[in-house]
Amino acid sequence: MQAADSEQRHPLDHSSLGGNVLLIDDSGNLVPTKLSATGSEIKIECQASLKHNTTYHIVVTDGVKTESGDALQADQSFTDLILANPAELSPEQQELREQVDRAITQAPDAGNPVYAAEFTTQDSYAVLDAMVEISLSEAEFASVPGDETKQREFKDYYDLYRVALKAPFYLPFTKDRELEECDLNKYDLKNTCKPLFEWITTEDGAFPTKYNPTPKITDPEYKELLETDIYVPDGWDRVTQLPTVIFVHGVTGEKGTVSTMLKDFTDNGYAVVAIDMPYHGTRIRYGNADQDNPEQEISARAEKSYFINIDSPLALRSNLQQSVADFISLRSALNSLDWVKKTDVHLIGLSLGGITSVMISEFSQNHPELTFKTANFVVPGQGLTNLVLNSHTLRPETIEGVKDSSDVERSLAETLLPNICTEEATNEECIVALHEFEAESQENADAIASLKDDAWALIEPELLQGVQLTIDSSDPASFTSRQTENGQPTLLLEAVGNCGDTCEVGEYMPDTVVPNSADNNIRTGTNPLIKALDLAPITEETTFGSPIRGVVRLTTGGHGTYMFPYEGPMDETGLPSLPTGEVMDFVRDATKTQQEMVASMVDTDGAEVAITNLEHVQTQVAAENEK
């Protein structure tokens, strides 16, 4: 928006927005929104996910006023469009006119429209639905538990078998491309390791869409099988049928981390199965196929951005879609094993694994052969781009990664050192010269730091919008409707801490990795995901239901306490301390309590959540968190 008579911006009266800024579905129903405005823009935030592949309309009327009482006016181009003779309009303008007319028709009782538009949401399900169908027909185990796949015994409460899973692979970065097409040159990574930034396509190289959703399998000969760990009760005879748990690890984790929560399951006669996500554990890539050079390691452990790839949002979307497809393949392949109780399979995901598990659960719906008895999400969230940028721990890493990227540093070198960083100069020449210039004086270092701050300020708004738009079709915010409608038995654990409005030293902080909410977006974090899944608060020591669909809010520890007792109360740094002594004992008890909650949910098929120590649980629910 701009003023009609000057460059000055006139702040809008927020009280005039309601009833005059309308988001309407194709049936004429108003969509609940949160409205805000400045003198330059009106911001419409949806309070819940819009339906996929659905048409919506926006109408703004002259009832919107500035703080001085002046009514909003239409831009002249809008007025010309709606007053023109349709026969005199170009085909593009005719289509635009029809969209505007349909939008205005949806708001017959609104005031005089000064803006109207129509849009259709992505068909966010199409590609993953296609992947599910491929998994159902292709996924199978290439080996099974036996003498040759049994690993040495680590503990006395489980046996471990390591087998191979044949699962469709869609990412362009296959193992064959490591040697010839990837060299981790930090000065020019996008050009020296192009496969890392590529994305899933169709067979003909196009973007998968609802019109052509089937992705290309990039390893059609299944040269690379997924190493699958199967933990079973000690002394299992390989015949007795076992209920089974699928575990999904977090970012920088790997399938072996499941060992910290096994005992509650293997002691009770369960098998626990785990695989690695792309760029994790056994699925690491290496530049030049050089596995002996740590500088050539392409893994989330070495650099989170290799998986959370905001430099290539389509690659990030593909990484998430591949992860969902892999676990759907695992679930499908379990049906071929005689010892698996096919109707007694459960899902547990932690952190990124919790985020991914929301989508795994969603795409298991309406397929009896993919059913999960319970779905358990530990510290997940939604709105992934804004989630990262509101995370205590991920935001600083992300900002520094962007500021220190070769793109930003090359641009600064071209500005500050034009005689050195010419068009012909390589990235390495430019960036090395910039670093030398920076080291010459504190004044130079301060100037570069200030310019990097300015660059980030310009990049962040585009990052929020552009990256999130791209990854919407691999974000749990888009995938809650099927499991909610079907009443999927669900337990979600949220780390809320025990602070008041602000945290003091000695108090347990809310989740410092996946924020529970974000001030700048009502759809970011764990709380909006809880709302989207329609989960009820669980505050009592034992909750019975048939089935349970609930959330336990945790006051002790933090993001990773379900697996490890490493997050103590906040210290002087403003982050969780490393607990010792009695505090360690208390946090360790919180870990035990959380693991028992999930184990009881699984063991009772979603009928009970046992809370053995209420000291670790929020027993009073804030009004905004009530169902």
Could you tell me what each predicted segment is?
Residues 1-177, 186:
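Acidic, low-complexity Ser/Thr/Gly/Pro-rich repeat segments typical of extracellular/periplasmic
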Residues 128-129, 140-244:
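Domain-level recognition of soluble alpha/beta enzyme cores
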Residues 385-386, 398-556:
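Serine-hydrolase catalytic core
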Residues 182-183, 192-225, 237-328:
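Cap/lid segment of the alpha/beta-hydrolase catalytic domain
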Residues 333-389:
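Primarily recognizes the serine-hydrolase "nucleophile elbow" in alpha/beta-hydrolase
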Residues 34, 55-57, 67-78, 130-133, ...:
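Short, solvent-exposed loop/turn and secondary-structure capping segments
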Residues 490-493, 497, 517, 529-627:
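C-terminal catalytic histidine-bearing segment of alpha/beta-hydrolase fold enzymes
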Residues 247-251, 350-354, 495-497:
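Glycine-rich His-Gly loop
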